[in-house]
Amino acid sequence: MSNHKKDSIVLHFAVVVLLLTSLAARGDEPGCTPSDAPSAQADSTAAKPAEPAPKPEPFAFADFTWLNGNSRQHKPVFDYPAFTGEVRVDTNYVYDLNHPQDHTLVGSSELGRTDEVQLQQLGVGGDFHYDNVRGRLLTQFGMYSTMTPRNDASPARGQWDLANAYRYVSEAYGGYHFDKMNGINVDAGIFMSYVGLFSYYQYDNWAYQPSFVSSNTPWFFNGVRIQIFPNDHFKEEIWLTNGWQSYGMFNDAPGIGTQTLWRPNGNWSILSNDYFYGKDTLNNAGRKRAHSDSSIEWKYRDTPDSKISKSALSFTFDIGCEYGGGVTCTGGTPAKPSQYFIGFMLYDRLWFDHDKYGFTLGGGAINNPGRYLVLMPPINGATAASGTPYFTANPGDPFRAWDASATFDYMPSDSVTFRYELNHRSANVPYWSGPGGVTPPGGNSGAPGSLVSGFQPDLRKAESRFTAAILVKF
């Protein structure tokens, strides 16, 4: 993309933001009166117009705490006029039947170590709201503070070490709420993407390890987001971001996308995330990316006084591709192979004894030739930026995988979940950590991801594991 076209994209988006904010603000300025307003000399005894009814909060018409990816708390613990606090603690233990000697788990954006108790996430912060000004901050301490930046290759371009600058922040943005329609929010910073249905925070989810269409797609975007609520059943988001789950920009163009969410009643939620354009391959400015992610959730049973108090189903389908820069979406050749992502996941959730217990069965599958969304195995310290010769991601390299899981939750209160989960994952190529692990004897050696003389990582085609976790949210 030429600089002229890039400037045009940014300029058009800026014009949209300015138009929306100016239209939303019109009539709200102090001293502004409509042209047909009565004059100051009007009869003071005339009846005053009734105060307009308060607008309903978005999606507050029903209880959506049953949704996968949505907090099940019915009200916040810390709630004050200008601040709603939030504390999250996620601690886990993973027992991997492959027994990697270096205790390193491969292929998960949620878990990284085995046979140890690990703090995955400690988040402290909340939402600030005063006079229509809004902001959100949530910290990111624990395993996430190194795993999440490691999957972002953009800090390798340029200076100031973006991976360290942002590693302790999961969400941080500020913006303004306009009282138009059912609300318009304009925010800038780091915000959750929810491409892939599951939440970044395990407390909100039906399962701990989501399938590939969630685990391999973005958890966050860094940029500008506009949320438009025409009514309390519908939301449209517009994104202008640095790129595909990236702190910085991979090349010379921003990522552009939208989210559409419709909840017609309390039993259905229909979501579509669409990433229309991005140039998200480091050092390959000719390669472009598009991706579509659609989910539907259906609560098909709600009988609070029965043994099964609730039942719900979720289905997610993803399709996307890369084109240009040596690859094509379809109809590839050996010289210019097809490079795409297609996958699905399906989960069924049951609640028992007035929602005190939960049981989830689910899984999914992907096909991702070129491996452009496959998480890089951390062989000899490899990152998304470094890559590794032990597991290539060249155009056309095949990767097909499937997984299944069974999850049992004990939820004695709205603030804690005790979770137990069995997972099995399988791929067409060796990918998961085997008994020999992925770390050279004596630790990482040389540059991240580089070859080590005499060392060969132990990668296997399948993995089965058990996870136990305590998930707390205040």
What are these model-derived regions, one by one?
Residues 70-85, 98, 131-135, 179-184, ...:
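Short loop/turn motifs that connect adjacent beta-strands in outer-membrane beta-barrel proteins
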Residues 87, 119-128, 171-176, 188, ...:
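Residues on the lipid-exposed face of transmembrane beta-strands in outer-membrane beta-barrel proteins
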Residues 89-95, 137-141, 188-192, 238-242, ...:
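Transmembrane beta-barrel strands of outer-membrane/channel proteins
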